[in-house]
Amino acid sequence: QPRSRGLGDVYKRQLIDKVSGRIEYGDGLKDYEIGYLPQQTVVQKDFPATVWEVVLSGTLAGSGFKPFYGKKEKSLAIEKMRELDITDLKKKCYRNLSGGQQQRVLLARALCATSKVILLDEPVTGLDPKVTAEFYEILKKLNDKGITVIMVSHDLQSVSYATHILYLDSKDSFYGTKKEFMQSDKANVFGQMEGDEE
């Protein structure tokens, strides 16, 4: 039985659909140039594939209609696994990994699809605070390398890592820099937070 969706869920879905290419947009970015890390469901967490198979599948967007993975795709998958320090997990079954390891695998998969933009939907849901902080540090390093990171999150800690914030609720919205957000009345929703400098 489908659950009712609040206005926040509707806003989130529209944003993700727009950015991930399900709705047409005209900024010159192609849908295959966006790496997407969806919010995981119980079924996805129990996916019976190896880490290698999951990461390698991220290269499909750029491989056209080739029926097999070539050297280029395999090299890219290896590079992204090294970048996220998951090469030792290559032969392990995805469903046997911890939540943090699964998110690293999915991020490596998303990065195989793009070097421009990654879109993440609630990527730290269910992760413990230490793993969450490590995941945010990985995202910061990717952003420092020039990859645009767009993240939908209810996690307050994510504000510390943001450069710009789009805040939506049923009555109001805000878009601006982190500094502008922290100086606005919207920041009161979050209470006192650290890392409010740009």
Q: Where are these predicted regions, by residue range?
A:
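Conserved ABC ATPase signature
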Residues: C93-L97, Q101
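Single conserved hydrophobic/aromatic residue that forms the stacking wall/gate
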Residues: Q1-Y11
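H-loop/switch region of ABC-family ATPase nucleotide-binding domains
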Residues: S153-H154
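Catalytic Walker B motif of ABC-type/P-loop ATPase nucleotide-binding domains
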Residues: I118-E122
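Helix N-cap at the start of a conserved alpha-helix in ABC-type nucleotide-binding domains
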Residues: P129-V131
